[in-house]
Amino acid sequence: IANDLPIQVNDRNTELELLYIDDLIDEMIAALEGREHRCEFEDTTAVPDVNGRYCYAPVTHHVTLGEIADLLDSFSEQSSTLVMPEIPHGSFAKKLYSTYLSYLPEDRIMYPLTMNSDERGSFTELLKTRACGQISVNISKPGITKGQHWHNSKWEIFYVVSGHGLIQERKIGRDKDGNLYPVRNYEVSGDKIEAIQMLPGYTHNIINLSETEDLVTVMWANESFDRLHPDTFYENVDD
């Protein structure tokens, strides 16, 4: 799969017990230091026993061929979908992904991204997740204002990593006296990287204050963009 070749699985339900190399090395080092784990065996199953006759590695993973194949397919598709599979700490998926990448050929290490460019600059999606949103990078040309919209449920965090800009936010609606809510101003710079949260129900923009340099902003959103349900409504911050 790392070489983009087809695989054949005759029985997806076949279960394997797999031991990751790092877990094996950790246990070997522990044994050398007198901290080994001991067991007895019932058939092929290790039963922990501090007085057991055998040393064993306690961390193994029971997975089916079908589960392995599905995970490998999701790893292979990541470069085209940008969706990072869930890889919790210590999980089989995390260990298998590291193993998969170690077999990746040189011509698959780098892959293209879609830059949505116009006269104002560009916007590029970098990475998506199923549970924790997506990461993008926005480039604004000198003097350009981007944004001027708000979201009902979506929220974002902006990180200016290069350039000098101004982020503005204003709560949608009016106060009890019928006045627009005040605009909040946050001056940002790549010389001092800070996190600015774009709140739900607040229209916001980002302005490149430089006359010569691009403004580069890394953006995290709590959900991946859905063209059918964009949850984006245009309203100027300074109306």
Where are these regions (language model features)?
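Mid/C-terminal beta-alpha module of Rossmann-like enzyme folds, strongest
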Residues: D23-D26, A30-M115
